[in-house]
Swiss-Prot record:
InterPro entries: DBP10_C, DDX54/DBP10_DEAD-box_helicase, DEAD/DEAH_box_helicase_dom, DEAD_box_RNA_helicase, Helicase_ATP-bd, Helicase_C-like, P-loop_NTPase, RNA-helicase_DEAD-box_CS. Residues 605-647 are annotated as: Interaction with nuclear receptors. GO terms for biological process: estrogen receptor signaling pathway; RNA metabolic process; RNA processing; rRNA processing. It comes from Homo sapiens (Human). This is ATP-dependent RNA helicase DDX54.
Amino acid sequence: MAADKGPAAGPRSRAAMAQWRKKKGLRKRRGAASQARGSDSEDGEFEIQAEDDARARKLGPGRPLPTFPTSECTSDVEPDTREMVRAQNKKKKKSGGFQSMGLSYPVFKGIMKKGYKVPTPIQRKTIPVILDGKDVVAMARTGSGKTACFLLPMFERLKTHSAQTGARALILSPTRELALQTLKFTKELGKFTGLKTALILGGDRMEDQFAALHENPDIIIATPGRLVHVAVEMSLKLQSVEYVVFDEADRLFEMGFAEQLQEIIARLPGGHQTVLFSATLPKLLVEFARAGLTEPVLIRLDVDTKLNEQLKTSFFLVREDTKAAVLLHLLHNVVRPQDQTVVFVATKHHAEYLTELLTTQRVSCAHIYSALDPTARKINLAKFTLGKCSTLIVTDLAARGLDIPLLDNVINYSFPAKGKLFLHRVGRVARAGRSGTAYSLVAPDEIPYLLDLHLFLGRSLTLARPLKEPSGVAGVDGMLGRVPQSVVDEEDSGLQSTLEASLELRGLARVADNAQQQYVRSRPAPSPESIKRAKEMDLVGLGLHPLFSSRFEEEELQRLRLVDSIKNYRSRATIFEINASSRDLCSQVMRAKRQKDRKAIARFQQGQQGRQEQQEGPVGPAPSRPALQEKQPEKEEEEEAGESVEDIFSEVVGRKRQRSGPNRGAKRRREEARQRDQEFYIPYRPKDFDSERGLSISGEGGAFEQQAAGAVLDLMGDEAQNLTRGRQQLKWDRKKKRFVGQSGQEDKKKIKTESGRYISSSYKRDLYQKWKQKQKIDDRDSDEEGASDRRGPERRGGKRDRGQGASRPHAPGTPAGRVRPELKTKQQILKQRRRAQKLHFLQRGGLKQLSARNRRRVQELQQGAFGRGARSKKGKMRKRM
């Protein structure tokens, strides 16, 4: 019988059984732990020894194994802890998310708080390169998340707020709205980093901006003009800046900011990192040499597919004077009432006119243009963003970078003259995976710009077919069609009655017409190829756009087809045959001539019909027109051509003249294409010529005059008269009523900065000195390296140091007073309001009124309770008193 391992036999109590189980479990745990320690020590020593032996064999004899530096190490070289932490943050597996980028916890927490899970393609390409410290020039289509591409590496580089005086990051934006949007996004993404941000914009009070810079911000978000103004006023040095961003870089370099950008770049240190972002950037980095790039990395995504797949485009051929009527019809009938729409116009006069006109037609709208007051711009944009109005009429000011949520439609009232401007306009919709629609009103003189746009996009332009059944809205994308005249007449009649009833609207319409004429004269010319193709297009026979034809009944469509057929009717009789009898000599000659030329006429009509069929189909993006398909072999065509010449003319003198029919050029191009050897043939321009011409900043690849102007060599004269000819230019003086010389006048209106450049003297008006005197702030160098941000303003003439001469300098490391902020807190505002209310109460005799009211209340209570009721009521009324 086996021995019993448990307690003694007999009746067991519950306490004894529990004690026995506890001891047994404790013995098992101790045995397992000792066994694991023995096996781990033996196996671990064996594995470490095996790894060391293998590494020693790879390194060879006599070479020590690399180890981590210890505390006894006397080397001055310390490991880069930032790189080690970043490598530790990276995941071993390829997750494809933000986790694999090695971002710090505050930055990653801000990304997760914002709701981003997976980086976009441009973020996946650019963020690792920027984190490596390289200069980057990046391009991706609108709505692809370019703002986070330069904000996340900036947060990762700056880490947290620094006590050193001076901003460490600078973000330049071309417009106020884009800078405000960048500030909002910076605060949301960098919520947990503790970095301070200052906003320097034109139109705001400079005193507030002085105070913001005295708060020692880490990041400055600014527009170039106001930043230069503040820098000159404060003698601001930017030597601590180590990260510079040019947002919408191509717009910055072409808006006339060259003088301001040169002054800003001259104030930057030599070793800063530069990042350029935009949706349209050329591949020639020579155009951005002024930005101070050092071995930059070019990253361009979506060069071939510049437009989003979720974006639908429609083009309507309308006259210039009927654009307002078509716009009103689109807003009333095509666009859904709950959708938000942005209308792009050419000038501010168009914006003011359309705002007043649409308001009279019960369309809630607002307008924004560059000359508008900054406060009004902010209010109008907020009204549109919050849904107070459904339509926003803007100039190209809002075409760059603005991310308006829930935007569904864009209407190009004035068709853009550049392809990349069209990209930025329609890029306001179809962002972040949403769908959108872009409607464009194209006047007949804007057809060459439309063809240039499709050359730039690499797409084909589809023309609406006349006298065809409506195909619905499925094939509307990228189609050019007419607007029914009945729609135009219906809307235009209402607009004309509105204009007749309003004198103000008539004045705005007249100003808008004059502005349109100035805009047409000043806009850049289209390419010669597009002008030639536009002249060859048959726009008279253009069909209705399917977006409109699908809304009509069958009877209305038949009426429109009848009107189109009447409009396209061309008489075959000549002037000699009209109202002429059969015996008339002129009529007989023309009939004989037509009978003799019947073959040539038939061939010409066949070619014309082929061209018309080709125009009804998609117009390809090639600069030259595609060849028509030939039905007959070339040899038969040549024989037929020879026979027709001999039949028409009785005598042929000299060589057989080449005919100038429609198929001749196509045949020649096909023959030349067959003779080319693709291996040795070098074209005179690259394949992406049209695309790069549209993206170019300096007009490279544009008109011949622009290229020739850049190649002009100005030689110095060899005589005194020729040397001073350029300086002695005369200018009309309106006050003196005569021509005056300009020599030396420019330098009087300019001042020389610390960088040696001359800028306008209006930048220096001693506003900063006046602000310091008002705030009683002592002079200090805001950009001195190593200074602490705790050095605040020092009060002059204080009670403590009165009569002791100059203030004692603070010892290094001791905190000094901070700058008194001009922005009041909520508690200060509430305290000030209560104090004002109390003062107003006392001034109007409030104490006397209060005491009189209390006396009346006591009398009412005494009359109502004492002496006229039960004793219980008297006691209750006493308690209430």
